[in-house]
Amino acid sequence: MLDPNLLRNEPDAVAEKLARRGYKLDVDTLRAHEERRKVLQVETENLQAERNSRSKSIGQAKARGEDIEPLRQEVNALGERLDAAKAELDALLTCINDFSMAIPNIPADVVPLGKDDSENQEISRWGEPRQFDFTVRDHVELGEMAAGLDFAAAVKLTGSRFIVMKGQIALMHRALSQFMLDLHTEQHGYQETYVPYLVNHASLYGTGQLPKFGEDLFHTRPLDEEASSSNYALIPTSEVPLTNLVRDEILEEETLPLKMTAHTPCFRSEAGAYGRDTRGLIRMHQFDKVEMVHITRPEDSMDALEELVGHAEKVLQLLNLPYRKVLLCTGDMGFGAQKTYDLEVWLPAQDTYREISSCSNMGDFQARRMKARCRPRGESKTRLVHTLNGSGLAVGRTLVAVLENYQQADGRIEVPEVLRPYMKGLHFIG
């Protein structure tokens, strides 16, 4: 959520910055709402003052023995007008809030201008794609040869875009998540955190999934049903519960940064992905991810983003998986992001790089929604924190990359050296 003062005082400047990401801010509606708010605010305050004055007059008239009925009727009429003005103001404030909640974040000045992913900026590459002297198999064929990926069973149990993993493939999937968690907690300074997989609507508003992206979530009740204590959604990423741990909190600045990581399943309806990546593990309704979240002082967040993406890169480097780092253009960034890097891993069967991690600085966009603040030592005044999040990594896509990059001519998979301690010392599977 953008700063309301910025929207009120500099709407044209905000509109110009948002236009860089292809968003047209309705400045006329914004101004009309603000003008009406000012009128109602003054009207409400005047009616309240007049009602208080008239109420005081009733006591004075009564003490003098005068007939107070005319004054009482006048006070009642003022009360009705005040209630009506308050109701209209409350409705308008709700409308303004809904309007503001739908506005995306302002891109950082360094973000390249562009319409879509074709205009993203490649920053660097690491590793050389392996040259195979045999016909490359994709991860689906390799997983089925190893009797470890069973898509048919998942369809029987649930439906499409789900998977049943078995045996050594399931072991490798678990090993990857354990390796990532150990790396982040032992070398990168994160606190491992276990979080709920169901969250309430307040959490989803806090990190920006609601109200705009409700159809992308799996809800325990219809989204249009009135919110209640039991109206939950499955998490689309553990960014949601991890970041919301600081909702409504005031943190002492000397405790920052906070660095948290969690391994969770993630659940997404993929409402806009019909027909895309229908084969294999690339785009699933349920997938595992190791998430990294930073809570920082405002002045530290851009440096923290570089650190965050470096931690995700380290996972790929230790697995010896070729990848490239991409700076997203304005038109390809997520709704709440100021600046985003994607890491794309090389998939031999697709002969291309595919996203495996997205790392974003959200600035104070989420913090304003969550009322997450920090306070400098010895001061009473608070300020909003900055929040960052990144995949470290998507476990299923990492499994895909390992299967395809480490495949042998006979269909077996060499186990990356760093995973062997997590896989009973196995050097090959399949």
UniProtKB/Swiss-Prot annotation:
Cellular component GO terms held in the UniProt record: cytoplasm
Binding, L-serine: T237, S238, E239, E291, S391
Record SUPFAM superfamilies: Class II aaRS and biotin synthetases, tRNA-binding arm
Binding site for ATP: R268, S269, E270, E355, I356, S357, S358
Pfam families: Seryl_tRNA_N, tRNA-synt_2b
Gene Ontology MF, one: serine-tRNA ligase activity
Keyword ATP-binding set for record: yes
Biological or metabolic pathway of the protein: Aminoacyl-tRNA biosynthesis; selenocysteinyl-tRNA(Sec) biosynthesis; L-seryl-tRNA(Sec) from L-serine and tRNA(Sec): step 1/1
A GO BP annotation: seryl-tRNA aminoacylation
Coiled coil: none
InterPro entries: aa-tRNA-synt_IIb, aa-tRNA-synth_II, aa-tRNA-synth_II/BPL/LPL, Ser-tRNA-ligase_type_1, Ser-tRNA-synth_1_N, SerRS_1_N_sf, SerRS_core, tRNA-bd_arm
EC numbers, comma separated: 6.1.1.11
Family: Belongs to the class-II aminoacyl-tRNA synthetase family. Type-1 seryl-tRNA synthetase subfamily.
UniProt domain comment: Consists of two distinct domains, a catalytic core and a N-terminal extension that is involved in tRNA binding.
Annotated protein name in UniProt: Serine--tRNA ligase
Species the sequence originates in: Erwinia tasmaniensis (strain DSM 17950 / CFBP 7177 / CIP 109463 / NCPPB 4357 / Et1/99)
Higher taxonomy: Bacteria, Pseudomonadati, Pseudomonadota, Gammaproteobacteria, Enterobacterales
